[in-house]
Amino acid sequence: MKKIKVLIVDDSAVVRQTMADILASDPHIEVMAPAADPFIAAERMREQVPDVITLDVEMPRMDGITFLKKIMSQHPIPVVMCSTLTESGSETAVKALEYGAVEIIQKPKLGTKQFLEESRVRICDAVKAASQARLRKITPRTGKEIAPKLSADVILEKPGSKAMIQTTEKVVVVGASTGGTEALRVFLEALPADSPPIVIVQHMPEGFTRAFAQRLDGICRITVKEAADNDTVMRGRALIAPGNRHTLLKRSGARYYVEIKDGPLVSRHRPSVDVLFRSAARYAGKNAVGVIMTGMGDDGASGMKEMRDAGAVTIAQDEATCIVFGMPNEAIKRGGADRVIPLDTIAREVLRLCG
């Protein structure tokens, strides 16, 4: 199997070395000579074309966004943005997704052994996902211990054959990963102000989901916000799961709400789509509509099958419109998807099902 060639671009020597060590620990990844700025990176790319670039957001001489635009206009290559958790850094990294970047990762930093191991898994997975991305024109607006692949059982036990509480109010749950930020923009922009309530898990690091939600809120007719514990799930509003926390759909009487909780990685992710979908199967049952969008891996596939078994209607994005046809494909293969449709028709279908 051909190794994924990665070019690291960061002005910090410490970050360059740390990233190189992390990526080199994966037998499927080959690290090219790193670059301290975009000008050196351009020289490296003339010598050897990388499969993936990890790009610092803030650098002297030329910032990451400017270099990203040049890459995408001249020689499109999958780019993973690497950012700190500052407010400006988060906003810029999210903006980069509109210019063609396919993933965001948090810069590695010192922490507990568990934190460092989870960071290693996330960074390597982001690069692998990026290497599979099918780039298209964006319209702006081993030997190592690996994280165990836990199921949603560690957060919420399997639902029974029926939802715990019978309801009539429809609720929509959505899961996405690589390429999902653009897919979610297309989906949410098409919804009217009084759309059904929506809860979303988009794989994204802690600190970036708020900026992502704010950007969507500024361009959509519905309200979009980062979910907080006990937020009411209501019409005309989409809640986006915060990074690094699991988000569950719950119901108390006539009210849907979200529970935000800690816990181990599930299907190698936190937040996990499987956790959200399982909670929807239990608490909404046949009144839920599940949507799984572009992304690498299989997070959400098992949960979507549980939703369908509980009577929910489930939708998978089709291969032609996915950046990475991993998660939807797994859901289809496991019998979790009722229907497979193009991205630009999902909003219309959701509205029809909830009408």
Swiss-Prot record:
The modification 4-aspartylphosphate is found at residue 56. The keyword Hydrolase applies. Phosphorylated by CheA. Phosphorylation of the N-terminal regulatory domain activates the methylesterase activity. Pfam families: CheB_methylest, Response_reg. The active site is at residues 177, 203, 299. It is found in: Cytoplasm. Residues 5-122 form the Response regulatory domain. SUPFAM superfamilies: CheY-like, Methylesterase CheB, C-terminal domain. This is Protein-glutamate methylesterase/protein-glutamine glutaminase 3. It comes from Geobacter metallireducens (strain ATCC 53774 / DSM 7210 / GS-15). The lineage of its organism: Bacteria, Pseudomonadati, Thermodesulfobacteriota, Desulfuromonadia, Geobacterales. The gene is cheB3.
